[in-house]
Structures are given as structure tokens and as C-alpha cells.
Amino acid sequence: MYQDYKNVEHVKPGGLELKDRLVGVQRVTKVTKGGRAFGFSAIVVVGDENGVVGQGLGKSKEVADAISKAVEDAKKNLVRIPLHKGTLPHEQKGKYGGARVMLLPAAAGTGIIAGGAIRAVLESVGVHDVLSKNQGSSNPHNVVKATFDALLQLRSAETVAKQRGVSLEKVFKG
């Protein structure tokens, strides 16, 4: 699912204490010649609140089944996100479909300044201080995927230093 991103560390769910957050449930309709067939679509974010997070989509005729399918899908898509002292290592933008998300690191004590779907993802990752802005589409599916796009582009200072072949001091001081 995350093949387009470099340096993505996939994580197995075994041994992790994962908490799931329901982002949204939508009732969907399929119109057939015999009438309307109703179903449900659920999007869920799971994480250990310590840098590991995953998102999943589940569909079923029943709400509970859709949610449980979404949780199982999310556990299959776990990735590790680099964090720095309870916030993000640097500013990052992400996009998916019509949704655009901007994430900014914040000083300690700021809290999570985010709404709806972005908040659920950031809480599941374990970020405590961050500023965010959602632009464009507010569709929860697209916003979650745009947030993941931004998070998967994050790189720690150690990773940047290793890729550039310089010391950590050189990364920070230029």
C-alpha cells in the first residue's frame, strides 16, 4: 500500500498494544432492479501512540462487521513514523484526491490543534504537540490518506544525516 514512499518501516501487530479510533461510518446505497441495497463503509485508524499507526477501510451490510473489517485492514497496514520530543521532526504537506493537509511541529504544551480525521490519526501516532490545516476536501477517507501521505514523508534528523553523508551537527547548523 505504501510502495511509493522511501524509508517506510512496516510493523507487525504482534506484541503491540494497539488502540483503534473510528474516524467515520457512511451508509452506502446500491440501486438494483429490485430496489435499493444498503450497506456500510467504515474507516478506522489504529496505533500504539508511540510512533506506530495504520489505517483501514471496511465494508459490510452491518455496521459492526464493517468496523471489525476496517480494524483488521488497519492492522495489516502498520507503519512506523519518526517523532521528535512528542512532535514532528519537520513541517510536511500531504495530499490525496481533493484533500490537502499541512502538519507543523509545535512547542511543548501546545497540544494537538487538529480537527476530525487528522486528530484521530495524530492521536494514534502519539503526537502530543502539533499544528495542522486541512484544505480542500473534508471527506474523511481522503483526509486520512492525505495525513498518511504527509506522515510517511517525514524523516528523522539521523536519517537525513545518513542520506547526505554528513554529521548530525552539520544537519542542524548547516
Swiss-Prot record:
Pfam families linked to this entry: Ribosomal_S5, Ribosomal_S5_C
Entry GO CC: small ribosomal subunit
Keywords tagged on the record: Ribonucleoprotein, Ribosomal protein, RNA-binding, rRNA-binding
Parts forming coiled coils: none
PROSITE patterns: RIBOSOMAL_S5 (PS00585), S5_DSRBD (PS50881)
Gene3D superfamilies membership: 3.30.160.20, 3.30.230.10
GO process terms (BP): translation
GO MF terms, alphabetically ordered: rRNA binding; structural constituent of ribosome
Self-association and partners: Part of the 30S ribosomal subunit. Contacts proteins S4 and S8.
Name by which UniProt lists this protein: Small ribosomal subunit protein uS5
Species in which this protein is naturally found: Christiangramia forsetii (strain DSM 17595 / CGMCC 1.15422 / KT0803)
